[in-house]
Structures are given as C-alpha cells and as structure tokens.
C-alpha cells in the first residue's frame, strides 16, 4: 500500500513536521507492505529539508504570480507524479492541497482516497473552503472537527486523531513552599496576533506575590516583548532564553522547578507545548482558545482554562497558584493525558484511515 502525504512547503522547524515524520516512520515500521512518500507544492527551494531524512519526497515548483496559473501548474505536476507512483491514499497536510489532490485525481485518471489533515485552525487560514475537496478528514482537535462540520461536512466523515506526545520518565517538580512561583512560556513570541504575549505580561504584572517567568522561544516581536516587560516594570522577573533546539532539556537542567506553563493565545491548532509540559508533570494555565486546550486540560486536575482576553480571570488563576491556595499533584498529571501518548495515538490514527477504506 502506498500513502502520499502532500502539502505546501513548510519551514522545517515546527511541531507539525515532527508529527508528520513520526507518523510516516511509524506506518513504514508497522508493515513492510506500507510505503510512504511526500509531495510538496513550492514557490522556491528554501524549505529546510533536514527533517525529511529517510523520507522519500518530490516537489513541484511554481512562482507564477497569477494564482490560477500557479495552481494549474501544480495540479499538472502532481497529476504526472500520480501516474508514476499510483498511491492508494493521499493525505493533505493543509487545505489548499485538498483542491490540488482532487483536481489531479480527475486529470490523472487514478483512483485513491483523499484525507484532509489540517494542522491549524480553519477560521484563521485562507482557502479553508478547499477542505471540502477531500473525501474524509482527520481533525487534530475537537474544535477543528467543529470547524470542518461548519463547512457542511458530515460528522461521520471526520475522525478526531489529536497529536501525539511521548511518555516521559522525569517529573518536573514545583518550587519549594517558601520560593517564588516559577512560570514557563515555550513558543513563538508574537506580542498580539495569535500568541498574545501582551496578555501574558499584563496578567503577571497585576498579580500579588513573588514570581519568575522563564521564556523559551523567539519570534518577530522578541524586542517588542522585552520592551513591554520594561514598560510594565517586571523585566527583573523575566528570564529570556531565546530559541532552543531542545527546550525541555533547558527546563530540566536550568530551570528545574516549574509552578505552571502559561499560554495566552487567541487561537491555536493543537498547542503541543501544553501536552509536552503535562507529560513532565507540569500543570498548564491556558486560554480556552479555538482549538486544542479544552481537549487536554482538566480544570483543577492538570491546569486551568480561562476565556481568551479575560485578563481578570487569568490573574485570578495566577494569584491562586502563587499564594498556594491551589496546588497540583505533579506526579499524577502525566496520567491525565493518556489518550495522547504515542502507542494509543498511532492505533487511533491507523484505525481512522483504514476504517474508511473498508467502506
């Protein structure tokens, strides 16, 4: 059986790439009869390909400015590739690729099943309507399932598969009782927009009690975020690490104790930083944004949720943690995310695909 994963060029550094490569390697290791390849639609050859090690891939290049001509070239190139490779399944890692796959299927005369597998919120992406060109759908969160259904697709054609996280052997403990609370942010630094780091700083600036914030990540607003911390007078409590290739090693080796990971996003696809934190026993205080956090966080057990933009509620959660009024058992938190661990994830992903093929 041949499975093709297709999509527009990606950065090569994100969590999406990690998930895709893990899925491909797991499929191929599960059976010698399964062969996976990738096909990318590119404007240039700037994509970092280190993550594609041991993965066979092909590319279609077009930098034509007129979108309908650019798309026509991609469809033609992909249809030629389909004639050569004859996949049984095509999994689209973004929505525009559903359109390419559908048109190329007709053009090539090949028969295969198209799955969409979008990794971002549909309400914040262009061409979201193109998802209807797929036959079936793999949703990485219950929120994205709702977004797919809102575009006229039956719930029977959608499987919620989430994203996987590996089981850890280490628990990151909280600080000792007489020490300041230690908060953690891991991710891109966008002052407003998607990540709302401004809300993170505004909330912390309004808390009572002692705390530190450790920030692991970089982004276009790095300097703007630093300047805002100075403006609020909290710069002495914020420790900046910049981008790190192994952020959780930094947490274990340098930070060592964490009270909670914080996420103040306006929207997400499936924020893996929450799952990674909880796999180490770290509770998470997150906005209940579309989509992902509500699938992972069980309030009072492994963290808390608040309405995006509701800074008063966010501050309330922070104050209760800082004062010790609310405590979490770090050692039981990894058990609260059991359904996201690798073995169960791949079993569900496999079933989501092959159950549809048997129809």
Swiss-Prot record:
Annotated residues for binding of UDP: 244, 276
The protein's name: Lipopolysaccharide 1,6-galactosyltransferase
Membership in a protein family: Belongs to the glycosyltransferase group 1 family. Glycosyltransferase 4 subfamily.
Function summary: Galactosyltransferase involved in the biosynthesis of the core oligosaccharide region of lipopolysaccharide (LPS). Catalyzes the addition of galactose from UDP-galactose to the first glucose residue of the LPS outer core.
SUPFAM superfamilies per the UniProt record, alphabetical: UDP-Glycosyltransferase/glycogen phosphorylase
Phenotype caused by lack of the gene: Mutant lacks the alpha l,6-linked D-galactosyl residue of the core lipopolysaccharide. Deletion mutant shows a lower invasive capacity than the wild type, but the difference is not statistically significant.
GO MF term list: glycosyltransferase activity
């Amino acid at each position: 059986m041949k499975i093709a994963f297709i999509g527009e060029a990606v950065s090569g550094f994100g969590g999406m790439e990690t998930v895709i490569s893990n899925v491909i390697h797991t499929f191929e290791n599960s059976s010698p009869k399964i062969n996976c390849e990738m096909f990318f639609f590119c404007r240039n050859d700037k994509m970092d390909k280190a993550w594609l090690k041991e993965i066979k891939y092909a590319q279609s290049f077009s930098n034509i400015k007129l979108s309908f001509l650019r798309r026509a070239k991609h469809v033609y190139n992909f249809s030629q590739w389909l004639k050569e490779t004859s996949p049984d399944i095509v999994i689209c890692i973004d929505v525009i690729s559903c359109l390419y796959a559908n048109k190329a299927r007709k053009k090539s005369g090949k028969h295969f099943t198209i799955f969409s597998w979008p990794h971002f919120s549909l309400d914040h992406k262009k061409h979201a309507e193109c998802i209807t060109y797929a036959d079936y759908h793999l949703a990485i969160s219950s929120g994205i399932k709702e977004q797919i259904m809102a575009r006229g697709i039956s719930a029977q054609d959608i499987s919620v598969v989430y994203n996987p996280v590996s089981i850890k052997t280490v628990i990151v403990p909280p600080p000792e009782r007489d020490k300041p609370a230690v908060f953690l942010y891991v991710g891109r630094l966008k002052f407003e927009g998607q990540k709302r780091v401004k809300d993170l700083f505004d909330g912390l600036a309004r808390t009572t009690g002692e705390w530190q914030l450790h920030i692991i990540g970089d982004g276009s607003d790095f300097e703007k975020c630093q300047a805002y911390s100075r403006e609020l007078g909290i710069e002495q409590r914020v420790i900046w690490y910049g981008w790190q290739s192994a952020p959780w090693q930094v947490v274990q080796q340098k930070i060592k104790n964490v009270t909670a990971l914080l996420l103040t996003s306006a929207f997400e696809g499936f924020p893996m930083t929450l799952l990674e934190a909880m796999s180490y026993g770290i509770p998470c205080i997150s906005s209940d944004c579309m989509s992902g956090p509500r699938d992972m966080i069980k309030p009072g057990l492994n963290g808390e949720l608040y309405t995006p933009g509701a800074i008063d509620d966010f501050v309330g959660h922070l104050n209760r943690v800082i004062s010790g009024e609310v405590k979490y058992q770090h050692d039981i938190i990894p058990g609260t995310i059991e359904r996201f661990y690798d073995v169960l994830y791949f079993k569900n992903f496999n079933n989501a695909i092959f159950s549809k093929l048997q129809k």
